[in-house]
Amino acid sequence: MALLTVQNLSAGYEGKPVASGISFSVSSGDYLTIVGENGSGKTTLMKTVLGLLPPVSGKVELGDGLRKNRIGYVPQQTAGQKGFPASVLEVVLSGCLGKSGLFYSKKEKDLATKQMRRMEILPLQNRAYRELSGGQQKRALLARALCAADSMLLLDEPAAGLDPVVTQEMYEVIQSLNREGVAIVMISHDIQAALIYSKTILHLAEKPLYYGDVFGYKREYFLEGEQHA
Amino acid sequence: MLETLLHYLSFPFVRYALIVGVLIALCSSLLGVVLVLKRLSYIGDSLSHIAFGAMAAATALNLSDNLLLVLPVTIVVSILILYSGGRTKIQGDAALAMLSVGSLAVGYMLFNLFPPKGGNVSGDVCTTLFGSTSILTLTKEEVWLSVILSAAVVILFVIFYHRIFSLTFDEDFARATGMRTGLYQLGMAAVVATVISLAMNLVGSLLISALLVFPALSSMRVFHSFKKVVICSAIFGVSAALLGLLVSILVGTPVGATIVAADMAGFFLFGLIGLFKKGRTA
Ligand SMILES: Nc1ncnc2c1ncn2[C@@H]1O[C@H](COP(=O)(O)OP(=O)(O)O)[C@@H](O)[C@H]1O
Ligand SMILES: [Mg+2]
């Protein structure tokens, strides 16, 4: 059974599609990377999948008992978060809101601790989020997303703004989560990394240019290692 | 000096002023944290000008309690701003500037066309803009209304504290975790409007922004967690209001301006503390 099924979806704003004809599905253990140029509608697609935007047409279905508030989402950094006063723990705990009552119980605090340990940021839990490095901030956002759901993560350009070493680390963290059974849907314009780490690729333009496994994508776009940009 | 103070405190209207002043400052400083972090402080400013227009209209209509008109008008406009803000992004701030300066002008016009009975126009305008004496002339009913509304604001803030954090830090994520953010924004718009209507009595329309902005900005310079910023902001706002009120009662300076002066002094103090802390950790 698929965790997420998208059928003939058009995603866009106020009834005007940005990208259309999109179909794909994500099952447990999958690792899908959505690639495409800036402005091709990757973020718009992800927000539609999350229910933040209404679909222009087509369908988004969540399966296997996955509820709307049980998807882990790692958004791109927004400008407002740069100087925001919040401790790492406060940020991570906010991932439990979909499950908690008005206040956090021990269960949610334990969950936050567990996910921070998993992301190796437990010692940073009382530090200021705004003073962390870019990579540490991304780990905090990952831990927050994992608190919300650990069957599927949706990540919007998780490597944006990170230096090459930290980028590499980030991809490895995401891969290890995938090996632990977390389905990954990731937006990236780092095609090289997508080819290495992911299992399926969705190449988005106004219409999807490609959807299928990595090997087919390599054959189609990278004949003998020669890059068609 | 203590004796003079005790003497003043024996008057009920002075006690009323202190109670209401502290409560309004508390609410404003809590909401201010959210407004500053969401970069919406300009909305507070605009709403306070709208409230001035509504106050003028209420005076012209000779209402028994001006709040009866000011409160609903400000709440409705606040909600309208919230909704139009989502749609017409491009010139939203210019439209808001137009609306707020327009209601200032119309308000002043109304004060002149329908001067309050027995009052003088410039005195009334001055009171409504700068809150010169209104806090000292509260009736018992006004005091109760302020107490109840402020208590409601504080209780709501505490109950929904974690959700307010999530909504402020990352709206998209909050929605993705199932939060009905539209509802919370509606509530927030109504609460901000309520606090601004109440604050008209304390500092007057032009100085309300100070109550919202100074405590939050000062606390953010010193503290790094949301909880500490919220708590510090509340203490900061209340202390500045108390200090300003006491000084103005003792020395006879205008209430609103004295409170804002206390806020400014606190801001510089916290700025220095922030620099000092940074210097030690760097
Ligand atoms: N809030 C919005 N309203 C209308 N159009 C938007 C909005 N946000 C983005 N767009 C447009 O949608 C297109 C796709 O944007 P986006 O999904 O962010 O692209 P990507 O993430 O692939 O870089 C762009 O042309 C952009 O201008
Ligand atoms: Mg994008």
Model-inferred region functions:
Chain A
Residues T200-V214:
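H-loop (His-switch) and adjacent beta-strand-loop-beta switch element
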Residues A128-L132:
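Conserved ABC ATPase signature
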Residues L153-D156:
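Catalytic Walker B motif of ABC-type/P-loop ATPase nucleotide-binding domains
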Residues S188-H189:
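H-loop/switch region of ABC-family ATPase nucleotide-binding domains
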